[in-house]
Amino acid sequence: MIKVNNTFIIAIMGVDGSGKTTIAKHLNKRLKKSKYLHLKPYILFKDRRRVVQNPHLEKKSSFGVSFLRLLSWLISYKVFFRSNKNFKACIFDRYAHDILIDPIRYKHNLSKGLTKFILNYFPKPDLWVFLNPNLKTIKSRKHELPDKVLKHQVFNYSKFFKTQKIPYLS
């Protein structure tokens, strides 16, 4: 991964309902010259996010669309950090690597190997935060995903952080 100079990047990761948004927005208020971002900067395309009741029922994109989507994310990250040098901290509520943990959410259809290769060119967070509350807490906040899917995602997040050999808070 690529290191961005002078900007401290915090990537907060976890399943839906783990508290990412709450913590990220709180940090953004407390830190001077900081920027809150959800998943990625919206540089090439408008922010057209919408609440999807069950993201796992969405149909996967084609290889080409998945490749172009990830490439557009990479360009957006690069352009954002090159043109916004006055931020001391960027707090991400999810980070691009979330696509490895839950590719279905992003309708992602690239191999894990190719995805990891491309992700190596993304700016490297200085601090990864993995939020892992118990299943009861998660279910009290979010109801979109069944327990089996949530448990699988928690397992994948845990595996990601262990295998990446990157320092993180849990």
Model features per residue range: what roles?
Residues 21:
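Walker A/P-loop
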Residues 1-9:
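Extreme N-terminal, non-catalytic leader segments
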Residues 28-37:
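Post-Walker A helix-loop "phosphate-sensing" segment adjacent to the P-loop in P-loop NTPases
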Residues 17-18:
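ATP-binding Walker
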Residues 39-113:
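ATP-dependent small-molecule kinase phosphotransfer cores
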Residues 12:
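Hydrophobic anchor at the beta1->P-loop junction of P-loop NTPases
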